[in-house]
Amino acid sequence: MMKKLCIDFGSGYNPKTGYKTCDVTSFPQLDFQYDGKDEIVGLREKSVDVFYLRNVVHHIPDLQRTFTTLKKYLKLGGKLVIIDCNKNHYKTNVFLDNLWYRFVGNNNEIFISKQYRDYINVLLKLGFKQLYYKSFKEKEITKYECN
């Protein structure tokens, strides 16, 4: 049986156990690097079974472009799993991200969207099929299938 290719997209410092890693940064421990535009260096198109994005969506400058790129690399029927802050807690999340990245980490390169963006609608317009949605506390979990 062929092993599934699962990638933690935006994994940064703390990747999901058992997943390959991919980020826009050039950390040496990453398996793949996203060029921030249309390519994931070192990855074949239509080869990914699952992209996992945890606390990443609010750091993506151009949602449509990035999701279009991920779709290009997903197999037909491949999954996109997103865990991110929900709309009701977004301002708190932005405050904490700014505190962490700008003051503690002194990192001005990481994008932080100042307002909540409807990434779900972007995915649906790109042809992803929503399989699951749950909002709890400050987070929401969504799962999509690539058509």
Where are these regions (language model features)?
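Short alpha-helix
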Residues: 110-127, 133
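A conserved beta-strand element that flanks and buttresses the S-adenosyl-L-methionine
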Residues: 52
